[in-house]
Amino acid sequence: MQRRSFLKHSGMAGILAAGSAPAFAQGAPTIKWRCASSFPKSLDTIYGAAETAAKTVSDITGGKFQIQVFAAGEIVPGLQVADAVQNGTVECGHTAPYYYIGKDPTFAFGTAIPFGLNQRQFDAWWFFGGGKELYNEFLKDYGITSILCGNTGAQMGGWYRKEIKTVADLKGLKMRIGGFAGQVLAKLGVVPQQLAGGDIYPALEKGTIDAAEWVGPYDDEKLGFNKVAKYYYYPGWWEGGPALHYFCNSAKYNELPAEYKAALHAGCQDGNTWMMAKYDAQNPAALRKLVAGGTQLRPFPKAVMDACYKAAMERYAEESAKNPKWKKIYDNYVAFQKEQILWFRVCENTYDNFMATAGATGAAKK
């Protein structure tokens, strides 16, 4: 990528056009925002993306634009961040948009839908496939402006007290699962529960729920799920590349000077890259530790995957038939995904599959 193109999409173009970072000190206003996170501080990666973005914003502006991040519950509960942004309680929030599908299922596209885009594909759709424009158009009714800031990559399929051998094993299962996936699994008999990250462990421990999904090995081990559930399934087909965002109050965002907006976008881009890189760096060792401690790693049976895929497609057809806002984004999203699958199947998947086999047989060892 040429340097000019990179700077444009990283949010730095406006800053460089203005001169340089020290220019902020010459009569620039001091602006302080509060950011409500949906996540606890103990989850240093998913919470840390918001702090990384805030630090970058401060560094770029010479401390003139400061964003203070508050953990879930310090200002509002984790699942009420969008409301706090919308009503002006805080200027911005770092959250997973699919938490708010109760308002409209279309919110899910900001994070992930079952059998959707992976992390790289999501970023491509967001920046170059019309995703950013379509999603922010949808958010206008809520007075929110969204800036991409984080991704976990493909997630694990969750923790279960019993094995999932057939589709029938899903019936009656009380499971903590966020976003649109709960509606899909409900078609197969699962009883979905929406809980914030910090509330999952006690619910599993007390038996209030039978299963729970969160992110992946690094976070899951920190939260101690392996102590209260034995079976760890993969893949998390509902979250192939779930994204996090800075939800900004649109009125406050629009008041920002152009240079501060550019700094905010650059900061979020920094947080986006930092979060994905840290998860990729930390997950392998965490998975090894979990398995060494007795966790039983299991793939979902193909029959279960097939049934879930069928249920997801049915649910999408239902929503498209009755929700124009959903359909507008869904049609664009699916068309983009089809092209991505073609490309990944030709090159990316071929390479990854070969390396997985080569690594297993020792061919990749020195």
Describe the predicted segments one by one:
Residues 2-19, 24-122, 130, 134-366:
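N-terminal secretory/targeting leader peptides
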